[in-house]
Amino acid sequence: LQSEKLGSLNDRQREVLRDMQSSGKRLQQFIQDFLTYSALETGGLKMQFAAGNINECLSDVCRLWSTRFQEKGLALYFLANDKLPVFPFDSPKLERVISNLLENSFKFVPRGGTVWLHAEPHMWERRAAAQPASAGERRRQDTSQPNAVKVSVSDTGPGIPAEYQQEVFDDFFRLPGTESHEGMGLGLAIVRRLVQGMGGKIWVESDPGAGCKFSFLIPFKPVPSAAGKGKTR
């Protein structure tokens, strides 16, 4: 109908069709969130690790979001980091993590704002972290070498008060005063579970009125042999 192949439309009809399309996309997103959440809750969502280039993965997600950001008047920046090695990760799950974080910024950053996506090698001092090393994962002997990738999504949005910076990752949690925004409070909860499923951890740094910076770590895994590629856990 929107192509007007069946006849011309007036402005009101175009507006109604746009609203219908937007509602359909929201419903599709809600269904996807519920299915992902349910699979994570029941342990039915398995991680599938394969060696890949994380720069390509992040760039692909940015391309998918670029049009929507432009339409809202937001700037989205990603600069590939050539210091990142090829290592095994679950590309579809990582894409979902990044997409959810970008969607979160998209919802709350006002027109004229900016969002940055950045990734870099990182030395994860697990003994100082709240989350223990996952079973079977060996620490590198040379602790001076990066053992993880740190991915960050920063924005110029309204920020998150300190008292809610842990709760934002809880199931169905929504910040007070954000009820008018789309969503059910599952996006960041799904992000947390997916990151933890990849052996990582996630946190947010923010000051009210000064934007947000969501960061997560994913440990480097050894590149599997030909016989072990595509192994799930």
Regions found by a protein language model. Give the residues of each.
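A conserved beta-strand-to-alpha-helix junction within the catalytic ATP-binding
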Residues: Q48-R63, E95, P121
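Short helix-loop "hinge" at the ATP-lid/N-box region of the Bergerat-fold HATPase_c
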Residues: S105-F106
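Helix-loop junction within the histidine kinase core
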Residues: S38-F49
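Short alpha-helical segment of the dimerization/phosphotransfer core of two-component systems
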Residues: S22-L27
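Short alpha-helical Gxxx[C/S/T] motif in the catalytic ATP-binding
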Residues: G187, V191
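Short conserved segment of the HATPase_c
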Residues: R140, P146-A148, I160-F172
